Structures are given as structure tokens and as C-alpha cells.
Curated annotation (Swiss-Prot):
Binding locations of GTP: 18-25, 36-42, 68, 122-125, 150-152
Subcellular location(s) of the protein: Cytoplasm; Nucleus
InterPro entries: P-loop_NTPase, Ran_GTPase, Small_GTP-bd, Small_GTPase
Function: GTP-binding protein involved in nucleocytoplasmic transport. Required for the import of protein into the nucleus and also for RNA export.
Protein name: GTP-binding nuclear protein Ran-like
Amino acid sequence: MQPQEEVKAIFKLILIGDGGTGKTTLVKRHLTGEFKMQYNATLGVEVEQLLFNTNRGVFRIDVWDTAGQERYGGLRDGYFVQSQCAIIMFDVASSNTYNNVKRWHRDLVRVCGNIPIVICGNKVDIMHKKTWKKGVDFDRKTNIYLIEMSAKSNYNVEKPFVYLLRKLVGDPSLQLVQSPAIQPPKVVFTDEMSRQVESLFNEAKSKPLPTIYDIDL
């Protein structure tokens, strides 16, 4: 995307979660329209600049893509500093990555405080491999939003960024007026699959709200 107007604001986004959950894939889908079929563990951090052309002007999000593996844990706090928003990703087909959402959130809040956060359950195109049991619906009590996504099928890949921009700009009516470059999906995400996922997440959101640090993920 080549915007015709000057960037109105630049925001730092920290992208965290266990290795293999699709963090780098999400960034590359927006940056190049490509999906990485082979996963390579990110070494340290990669910073990618994503431009979003909205009805409120052009905004840039600098996405800090950190390594999700524990051996890099000592480096994470430094990358969290001055982050204005965050995405925490887990793989709906991996219970381990789902179980670690609470830990990632705790580490993030300890450094950054109450910044806007999106929790993304990625790979919902693999419905038959789903292992998580219930949603992590924090948005009614904290500054967090839960979304289902599939980077491989392009399902909801723009939604986390639009939500965060609305929070950061303070305008719930903010919309994209030009979509980032995204290639056709690698798999077809049918309407029926979409209805199943939406039903599952709506059911989770109707459950009594737990205390964030006492959640049995």
C-alpha cells in the first residue's frame, strides 16, 4: 500500500505467544501477502512496519515479533517497554500454547500496564484438531479482546489491527478504506466453518467471567 497522505501516528505493537502459533505468519500476510508454509523459530525479534489506510487517515503500526521460546525469556522485558498495544497468539490445535496465554498476559501487564490487547486463537481452519475447551473472555473486565483467526485462510487477519487502532485512536467507527496486500487463501474457510467458530466463541463469552489470574485454561 502506498498512501497518498502523511502518516498521522506511529504505534508500537508487541506480538507475543508460544513459538509456532503463527505470529510471523500473521505479520507476513499483511506485509507481503505471503503465507509461510515452513516455520522457522524467530531469533530474538523482528520489527515490521505495517501501514493501514483508514477513514481517519494513515497509521503505522511497528510490529515487534518476539521469539516465543522459553530460552529467550530473559530478553522479553526489554522488548515490552514502551509498547502501546499487543497481540497474544495461541494455536487452537495446541493445548500447550493455549495454557500459556495467562503467563504471557501476566508478563505483558507487569511491564506495560493496561494497554489494549487482542488475544488471537489462530488456525481455526483446523477444526477437527481443536483442543481448547473454553474462551478466554477478558474484554468485559479488562482492556482485552478475544478473536478467532486463520492466517492460512485469511479469516479475520485484519480484525486485530482494526480493533487496536480503534482503541489507540479513540474512535470506534474507524474502518479500513484500503485493505493491505493479501494473497488468496491457501485453504477455503467456508461459511459453515465460520458459523461453527462464531458459535463456539459466542458460547464462551456467555459464560460467567472468571478472575483473570485464576482461569483454568
